[in-house]
A protein has these predicted regions:
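Unchanged
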Residues: 1-258, 368-370, 376-377, 407-421
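Left-handed beta-helix
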Residues: 1-4, 198, 206-421
C-alpha cells in the first residue's frame, strides 16, 4: 500500500543540555560519522519508503543543512516522492509553534495528504535502532487496525518515562498509560505509529476540537482511541532500540557499539545506515599510539604515546602525545592536547582540552556522578581539572576557569542553556 512517512524532528532534547543548546536533538552526532536522524531516514529507504516528510521546529539549521535535498539517502526525488522539510508557519487560522506531536501533524495535514498515501507511518527522529517498517505495515493491514503502535520491552525503571501498554492475547491494546508513576507493565511504545489516512484525519480533527487536550499522541490520541473501542494493536519489536534523550543514555548507547559483538551492528551490509559525509583523509594512528575497542572516524590523528580505549572519535579529532582517552565520546575536530586525560566524558565539536588538563575520571567502586560534558568550542586551559559529572558550557574560554578547576558534578557556563524539559 502507498505509504508516506512523517518524521517528528522538532524536539529540543533539553536533557542533553549542552549537546542540544545550538542544535535539534535529531541533529546531534552519533557513532562518529552519523547524526541521530540518519537511523530513522535509513530505516525508511531500507524499507522501501521514499516519500518522507520531516517536521522540524527547535533550532533546525544544522538539521536542514545535513539533510539538504536528501541525496545520501536516495531521497532527492521529485514526482516519485523524496524528502520534504516543514517548519512551523503562521497562517490566518494557525498557531505558531506546535503544542504537541498530534498538533504538529494536524498543522501540516494539508501537505501530508498531497501525495494521497493510503497509510501514514509516524516516526520519531531521535531514536537509535534498525527496523524493517514493512513488517509493521503488513501487521497493520492483516489486523485491520485503526492504529498500530511499535512496542518493546524495557526495564521497569525506564517505564516511568514512557508510554506503557497492556494487550490481550491477540496484541490488541486494552490499556495505555503515558509515563505512569507506578507502571503495571514494561511493554513500552516506541513512538512509531501506523494509521490509514482517513482514520488519522478523523482522530486529529476530533482532538483539535477538545479544549482540554494537550494535542499529543501519547497523552491524548492513543488513550482516547483505546477508551472508545477503536482497533488499536501493538506490534512487537525484538531488536535493539534506545531513546538517547539523556546524557547517560547517549553515552551508554555509544558503549553498546563497542561490545563484542555490538548490540547494534553498524557493519551490517544488508542494512546500511546512510549519512552525509565530509571528505576527510584516512585516520592516522602514529607509531607508539594505542587504540583498543574504539570507533575511529576519517581524519582522526592519534599521536605517539597516546592511549585511546573504549571510545568513539568523530572526524578530525586529534589526540596528542601521551594523552589518554577512555570510555569517552569525542565529537568533530576536537583536540585533546599532549598529556591530557579524558575519561567518561563527552567532548563536543571544536573543543580544545589543553596539555595535561583532565576531564572526568574513572574511579572504580566510587559513587556514579554521571558523565562529564564539554560544550561546543569550549577551551579548557592546560593543567585544569574538570571533575566527574561536571558540565562545561558552550564557548567557555580559558579566562573562565580558576586554578581550582571545576568540581565534580558542578557547571561552568558562559552562555546559559535551558534545561529540564
Amino acid at each position: 500500500m502507498k505509504t508516506r512517512a512523517v518524521i517528528l524532528a522538532g524536539g529540543e532534547g533539553s536533557r542533553l543540555v549542552v549537546l542540544t543548546a545550538k542544535r535539534a536533538k535529531p541533529a546531534v552526532p552519533f557513532a562518529g560519522k552519523y547524526r541521530i536522524i540518519d537511523f530513522t531516514l535509513s530505516n525508511c529507504v531500507n524499507s522501501g519508503i521514499f516519500d518522507v516528510m520531516i517536521l522540524t521546529q527547535y533550532r533546525p539549521h544544522s538539521l536542514n543543512s545535513h539533510i539538504g535535498a536528501g541525496r545520501p539517502w536516495d531521497l532527492d526525488r521529485g514526482f516519485t516522492g523524496g524528502v520534504r522539510l516543514y517548519q512551523p508557519y503562521k497562517g490566518r487560522a494557525d498557531t505558531d509553534w506546535y503544542v504537541g506531536t498530534a498538533d504538529a501533524i494536524q498543522q501540516n495535514f494539508s501537505f501530508l495528504k498531497d501525495t494521497n498515501p493510503e497509510l501514514v507511518l509516524i516516526l520519531a527522529g531521535d531514536h537509535i535502532y534498525e527496523m524493517d517498517y514493512d513488517a509493521m505495515l503488513s501487521f497493520h493491514t492483516d489486523h485491520q487496525s485503526d492504529l498500530t503502535i511499535a512496542t518493546i520491552r524495557v526495564a521497569r525503571e525506564e517505564a516511568t518515562r514512557m508510554g506503557i501498554l497492556a494487550t490481550d492475547d491477540n496484541y490488541r491494546v486494552t490499556q495505555f498509560m503515558e509515563k505512569p508513576k507506578e507502571p503495571p507493565d514494561t511493554l513500552a511504545s516506541m513512538g512509531i505509529y501506523v494509521f490509514s489516512l482517513p482514520v488519522l484525519d478523523k482522530v486529529l480533527s476530533e482532538d483539535a476540537k477538545r479544549k482540554d487536550s494537550h494535542h499529543d499522541f501519547g497523552k491524548d490520541i492513543i488513550p482516547h482511541m483505546v477508551k472508545t473501542g477503536m482497533r488499536v494493536f501493538a506490534f512487537p519489536f525484538g531488536g535493539y532500540w534506545v531513546d538517547v534523550g539523556t546524557i547517560d543514555s547517549y553515552w551508554r548507547a555509544h558503549m553498546d557499539l563497542l561490545k563484542h559483538p555490538p548490540e547494534l551492528d553498524l557493519n551490517d551490509r544488508t542494512w546500511i545506515i546512510h549519512t552525509r559525509s565530509e571528505e576527510r583523509p584516512p585516520a592516522l594512528i602514529q607509531p607508539g599510539a594505542v587504540a583498543r575497542d574504539c570507533l575511529i572516524s576519517d581524519g582522526v590523528i592519534i599521536a605517539p604515546g597516546a592511549v585511546v580505549e573504549r571510545s568513539v572519535l568523530s572526524p578530525g579529532v586529534y589526540v596528542g602525545p601521551q594523552a589518554v582517552v577512555r570510555e569517552s565520546i569525542i565529537l568533530t575536530d576536537a583536540s585533546i592536547e599532549a598529556g591530557a586525560c579524558v575519561e567518561r566524558a563527552i567532548i563536543d565539536k571544536d573543543v580544545t582540552v589543553g596539555h595535561n588538563a583532565s576531564v572526568g575520571r574513572i574511579v572504580p567502586d566510587a559513587p556514579d556522578l554521571g558523565i562529564a560534558t564539554v560544550g561546543k568550542s569550549a577551551q579548557i586551559p592546560g593543567g585544569v581539572v574538570v571533575g566527574r559529572g561536571a558540565t562545561i558550557g558552550l564557548n567557555v574560554g580559558p579566562d573562565h576557569f580558576s586554578r581550582a578547576g571545576v568540581r565534580d558534578g558542578t557547571t561552568l557556563e558562559r552562555e546559559p542553556f535551558r534545561a529540564g524539559m
